[in-house]
């Protein structure tokens, strides 16, 4: 009996140093695990919020620079607002007061842009501080219709044809008049010769 108690006491004494160490480790590891889980949870929430914001931004402005291939031919990308704006009116010459503007320096012509309103308040404030309405540089050839160009080409060709026909007629008249003069002179010479021979025969 004493041997059993002694053995139990030895076992308890032998295991005693390890029990608090393991418990302290478990106590020390528990807050770290909770902190890690909390950080992972917060990062997941932040990622989800970023995705939602990007999704809303893309839905409000679906035609960004990366989606320029989706912009229709009658629309143009505006780098200021990040939106696809419609072209308004024709390409007009810049007035003297706007010659130094960025949209007039390149070609001296400008075309108005009609851009949709953004839901971003900061962006709206930025756009209001800039020129309103907005313009883009252009050249008169950008807005010329193909039909108008064809009509102008046909008119020029018709004018050249009329001029060439007139010149040709004048040249023909000159040649014909000189030919008629030569013909008349020959006829006169023939008449004179025939009259002279007739006079000789009568003699």
From Swiss-Prot:
Motif RxLR per record, residues: 37-40
Compartments, record wording: Secreted; Host cytoplasm
Inducers of expression: Expression is up-regulated during the late plant infection stages.
CC per GO annotation: extracellular region; host cell cytoplasm
Entry keyword annotation includes Transcription regulation: no
Alphabetically ordered keywords of this record: Glycoprotein, Host cytoplasm, Secreted, Signal, Virulence
Signal peptide start-end: 1-24
Glycosylation sites: 32, 193
Functional note: Secreted effector that does not suppress pattern-triggered immunity (PTI) in plant host.
Domain notes: Has the canonical translocation RxLR motif, but lacks the canonical EER motif, which characterizes most oomycete effectors identified so far.
Family, per entry: Belongs to the RxLR effector family.
Name listed for the protein in its UniProt record: Secreted RxLR effector protein RXLR-C28
Organism for this UniProt entry: Plasmopara halstedii (Downy mildew of sunflower)
